[in-house]
Amino acid sequence: AFTNRRADGYGGSLAKRLRFPAEVVRAVRAAVGGDFPILYRHTSVEDVPTGNGIDLGTTVELCRTITDAGVNAFDITAGMQCCFELMTPPTCMPKAWNAATSAAVKEALGDRARVMLTGRISDADTAERVVRDGLADFAIMGRALIADSHLVEKYAAGRKDEICPCVACGQGCVGNADKMIPITCALNPLSGREASMPSVPKAETPGRVVVVGAGPAGLMAAATAAERGHEVILLERSDRHGGQISLAAVPPHKEDLRLISDYLYGKAQRAGVTFRFSCEATPESVRNLSPDAVIVATGSLPVVPRFCASAAGAVTAQDILSGAEAGKNVLVLGGGL
């Protein structure tokens, strides 16, 4: 065992290590009676560096023992502090990645207890697949409902395109929780602000707004302005939406980031934004639209050291992600993502 180092009746063999949780469950059952559901959350895979953490075999045996003690359902999760990525799986991990474990537990328990699966169930299609394919009896969502608390309602109504996606970035949810500040969502600015801003307020005096740039910031700004009642025209130099988020989605295992721009583009379209692609914004072209307000959302530029700004063969990360050739001998400056 990785954490249980006891040498008494509660440590050592698996049977002894299961004694404490079994006693707790039996005590709870005695207190609440036979008709009260008891749910047990279990870390099914620890994957600790020493190799002696909980594994599938231990999980199945534990669930059998705890079921006998009086549990009605198991919430199958994974990880611990030393393997945090299993607790809150990031974008690079497959959706419902731990479904094989929940399926094994479900097969071992039969009808004696229900099995729930947690871990990167980021959308309703994945949740439905987990239940339909018999991988678990219930699919549990956490971060997906932070991204869009109306996910289930929209999915049931056939409005899947309106669901704000969760890409498991962990920026506003896990990141803020670690800092002990209120959680938010990097994609949904209303998340975490429901009490102070339950909906987007209408503008007192609607006007014409010109937005420059169809990246995530520009798309969200355009959609919000249109939802407030403004006439919105968005100018984009390229022939498509997405901006730099399209480049961020190029590396392996980052494909889900494309969901961000696709969702925001659809949101802006539904709000009534007029798009003008392959249209570079200039002071004159913007003035000709007679806007009441202009929002410039043209994104950031890479920081290029002066000593290599004009060097032959020098390219930026954006250039590489756009398809530029780096050559055979490459020097990389900077260790960020």
Each predicted region: which residue ranges?
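Beta1-alpha1 glycine-rich phosphate/pyrophosphate-binding loop at the start
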Residues: 211-277
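Short acidic/histidine-rich motifs immediately flanking catalytic phosphotransfer sites
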Residues: 71, 290-292
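Short, contiguous acidic/charged loop-to-helix segments that flank catalytic cores in large enzymes
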Residues: 88-94, 198-206, 247-259, 316-323, ...
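Short hydrophobic/charged patches on amphipathic alpha-helices used for structural packing
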Residues: 63, 124-128, 265, 283-287, ...
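Rossmann-like dinucleotide/flavin-binding elements
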Residues: 203-235, 276-290, 297-307, 313, ...
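Flavin-dependent oxidoreductase catalytic cores
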Residues: 1-212, 216, 220-227, 231-232, ...
